[in-house]
Amino acid sequence: MTENTAETADESSDGGVTATTGAATTTPTTPPEPVIRARDLDVFYGSERALESVDIDIPEQQVTAIIGPSGCGKSTFLRCINRMNDRIDAARIDGDLTLRGTNVYDAAVDPVALRRRVGMVFQEPNPFPKSIYDNVAYGLEIQDVEGDHDEIVEQSLRRAALWDEVSHQLDSSGVALSGGQQQRLCIARAIAPDPEVLLMDEPASALDPVATSQVEDLIEELAEEYTVVIVTHNMQQAARISDKTAVFLTGGKLVEFGDTDQIFENPEHQRVEEYITGKFG
């Protein structure tokens, strides 16, 4: 009779015997790859440097807030992700910025195809002078998105928490909606092509408190499906809705990045604490 012990013998591939213990081995977990990664990212407008040596890893299906004083490079960084800076003749981008491991500035990357993967919502609601339906369906048509467009439009409006308010008037003009409804329409338009990332540049700054609250609730819901990166001047908003916060300060430098609770409750850098507590900015 063979006695059971904590040590067992396994036959190796070369015929030998390898002793292994019965103790459980813990395999270190590898952190998931970030959706967006920047390394040594610099942006220049002519001779003026807008971003300097930015390193950041943005995680999947979380809300990452970008905060900092005016002119610190927040929106410039956001526009790098979907190459909106390409439209500025004097802009020059150095360094690496990857989306799921692919450098978005590689010559083989089509900016139009990139923007299908990376949707964007701007500061001011900007619905097209079209019907509510056509506002959402427009991106599907120009990007040749397959599938039932009626169904996609409805799903997008539902995800943007707008369907119940407009389902009876899809042929009405999008510009006739209230400001908050217009912004949610723009969000529906941005998510209709089913992007991986949703960029939001001060999406609630032009809205009243009620509409702002609706958009904030929506952002938290959208993070269950999308990676959301939001630029905001409203630090209370960043604290309420984001999982991660990046703090840019003068000169386009990313000074601190981490969990939002840690950034707001116990920042590592004095300048970050001074900015958050309103001593400058």
UniProtKB/Swiss-Prot annotation:
Function: Part of the ABC transporter complex PstSACB involved in phosphate import. Responsible for energy coupling to the transport system.
Enzyme Commission number, as recorded: 7.3.2.1
Source organism, top-level taxon: Archaea
Gene Ontology CC: one annotated term: plasma membrane
Protein name (record): Phosphate import ATP-binding protein PstB 1
Enzyme class: translocase
Family statement drawn from the similarity comment of this UniProt entry: Belongs to the ABC transporter superfamily. Phosphate importer (TC 3.A.1.7) family.
Pfam families registered for this protein in UniProt: ABC_tran
Protein residues bound to ATP: 68-75
PANTHER family assigned to the protein according to its UniProt record, in alphabetical order: ABC TRANSPORTER I FAMILY MEMBER 17
Quaternary structure and partners: The complex is composed of two ATP-binding proteins (PstB), two transmembrane proteins (PstC and PstA) and a solute-binding protein (PstS).
Subcellular location as annotated: Cell membrane
Domain ABC transporter positions: 36-276
Enzymatic reactions: phosphate(out) + ATP + H2O = ADP + 2 phosphate(in) + H(+)
